[in-house]
C-alpha cells in the first residue's frame, strides 16, 4: 500500500466526517520501513497489542514503539505517532532510543 494513498484516504475520511474521529480512527506511519519489512527504519511493532487494548479496553494508542531487531538485539526503537503528528528528537540521548523522541505536529 503506497503511503501517499493511505494518507489521502485518511484525510478524505476526516474531511467528510470532521476532525474529531480519533475515538475510532488512527493512522500510524512507519518511516524507513519497506513494504511490510526491511528498510533502514524499524520493522517490528506491537500493532495487534495496541489494537486489542483499544478495542477491548478503550485505551486509544497515543504512540506505538517500533523496533529494528537483529538476532536478539534491539538496534533501534522509534515512536510511531498518530498522523498528522510525527516523531521529533528531543536533542538529548541516543537517536536509537524511542524514549528520546516526542510526538508532535510538524
What are these regions (language model features)?
Residues 1-106:
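C-terminal His-loop and adjacent cap/lid subdomain of alpha/beta-hydrolase
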Amino acid at each position: 500500500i503506497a503511503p501517499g494513498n493511505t494518507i489521502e484516504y485518511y484525510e478524505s475520511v476526516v474531511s467528510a466526517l470532521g476532525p474529531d474521529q480519533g475515538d475510532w480512527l488512527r493512522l500510524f506511519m512507519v518511516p524507513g520501513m519497506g513494504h511490510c519489512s526491511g528498510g533502514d527504519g524499524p520493522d517490528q511493532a506491537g500493532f495487534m497489542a495496541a489494537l486489542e487494548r483499544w478495542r477491548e479496553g478503550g485505551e486509544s494508542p497515543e504512540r506505538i514503539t517500533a523496533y529494528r531487531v537483529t538476532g536478539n538485539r534491539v538496534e533501534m526503537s522509534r515512536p510511531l505517532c498518530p498522523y498528522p503528528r510525527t516523531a521529533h528528537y528531543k536533542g538529548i540521548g541516543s537517536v536509537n532510543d524511542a524514549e528520546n523522541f516526542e510526538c508532535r505536529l510538524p
